[in-house]
Regions:
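Central hydrophobic cores of alpha-helical transmembrane segments
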Residues: 220-224, 239-248
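Alpha-helical transmembrane segments
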Residues: 144-160
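Alpha-helical transmembrane segments of helical membrane proteins, especially in multi-pass transport
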Residues: 160-168, 183-212
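Juxtamembrane boundary at the C-terminal end of a transmembrane helix
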Residues: 248-255
Length: 255
């Protein structure tokens, strides 16, 4: 496949969710993404191109940021169906078509679960915490009204775009071996690290906010050291965080 068509496919994949329907979900976006490469693979054979388009117009639904792995893997498998002469191998065409359909179906579910957990439940809240923390640390003024949304947009979209590109590259390079590579990724461990980091950022922002006022400086320092000691003693970081919140609210009423 030509590099220009591969690049076009990648940029088209950004529009995967531009057209939704409740019957087949992301099927229109999927077919739109791979169409440039399908046209190159099948050339002037309009009948086989039409059959391929109908085949990929079937149900498809996964996490949009990790869908690129399935898209590039599908293109590799479609390309392998074509003999050196440029015509599909009739003997193996039906078998490979079923293999492609099966891989799309069996990969879409697990990848959707990984993406939902990693991006919706971890990355997005973490970037929101960073943006909110920026307000508490830097204060609210006319400049920060514009900077805070930019902090969130950049902190979220850098990993998001990276995973789109990296997943697309993995599918092109490793084909069906990408399944084994993805299974070896420690998504659960990384998600847990992000969760803990997010709570630490919340604690840090809370302490900095308290210390910004002379009246609450002592409380800020005290809460920081208490949090550090409790975490060192393996107390749940979530309990530490909510303890800090309740403590701050109580201190506010007392003072």
């Amino acid at each position: 496949m030509k590099n220009c068509n591969i690049i076009r496919t990648f940029f088209r994949s950004l529009l995967l969710q531009a057209v939704w329907n409740f019957e087949r979900m992301q099927n229109v976006g999927f077919l739109y993404s791979i169409m440039p490469c399908l046209k190159e693979i099948y050339g002037a054979d309009e009948n086989r191109l039409k059959n391929a388009a109908i085949r990929h117009f079937d149900f498809f639904n996964t996490h949009p940021y990790i869908a690129n792995t399935i898209i590039s893997l599908t293109l590799i498998l479609e390309n392998e169906k074509v003999a050196p002469t440029g015509l599909p191998s009739v003997a193996s065409e039906e078998i490979k078509s079923q293999q492609i359909k099966s891989l799309k179906l069996h990969l879409s579910g697990p990848l959707a679960a990984i993406g939902d957990t990693f991006f919706w439940a971890r990355i997005k809240p973490f970037c929101g915490i960073i943006a909110a923390g920026y307000v508490f640390v830097r204060g609210i003024n006319n400049i920060n009204y514009f900077l805070v949304p930019l902090v969130f947009i950049f902190s979220y979209n850098i990993p998001h775009i990276f995973f789109r590109f990296f997943g697309f590259w993995l599918g092109l390079k490793y084909a069906t071996d990408v399944v084994k590579i993805i299974s070896n990724f420690k998504f659960q461990k990384i998600s847990e690290i992000i969760r803990i980091a997010g709570i630490f950022v919340c604690i840090f922002v809370l302490v900095v906010y308290l210390m910004s006022s002379v009246k609450y400086q002592f409380i800020g320092v005290l809460l920081f050291f208490v949090s550090f000691v409790l975490i060192k003693k393996n107390v749940s970081i979530i309990l530490v965080f909510w303890g800090l919140v309740i403590g701050c609210v109580g201190a506010g009423f007392l003072m």
